[in-house]
């Protein structure tokens, strides 16, 4: 009943519902999170111009020693995406959890980004 395909479809439906309410602008871009089994990704996106301003993931060269998709890796990705955003002058974002429950790796990434200086 709740196999992987159905869970994925439900997540995509949740994400579409969230995306109808959330949109990133140049003043307040969107911090989008994607979680896979082996990695975690974060992007800061300007939806009006349709460009990715900043991105970070566990596949980056800086995370060679923190390979994986655990909470520690999510925390490192959150810190890195916030650091890169602040370097580009982005201080305030809208958080897009990507249809995932705000718990575990997604929450760790968000908390680390907040601690590093992003406001949302």
Swiss-Prot record:
Biological role stated in the UniProt entry: This is one of the proteins that bind and probably mediate the attachment of the 5S RNA into the large ribosomal subunit, where it forms part of the central protuberance.
Swiss-Prot/TrEMBL keywords: Ribonucleoprotein, Ribosomal protein, RNA-binding, rRNA-binding
Gene name in the database record: rplR
GO molecular-function term, one example from the UniProt record: structural constituent of ribosome
Presence of keyword Translocase: no
UniProt similarity note: Belongs to the universal ribosomal protein uL18 family.
Organism: Clostridium novyi (strain NT)
A cellular component term, taken from the record's GO annotations: cytosolic large ribosomal subunit
InterPro entries: Ribosomal_uL18_bac-type, Ribosomal_uL18_bac/euk
Subunit relationships: Part of the 50S ribosomal subunit; part of the 5S rRNA/L5/L18/L25 subcomplex. Contacts the 5S and 23S rRNAs.
GO biological process, one term: translation
Protein name, as recorded: Large ribosomal subunit protein uL18
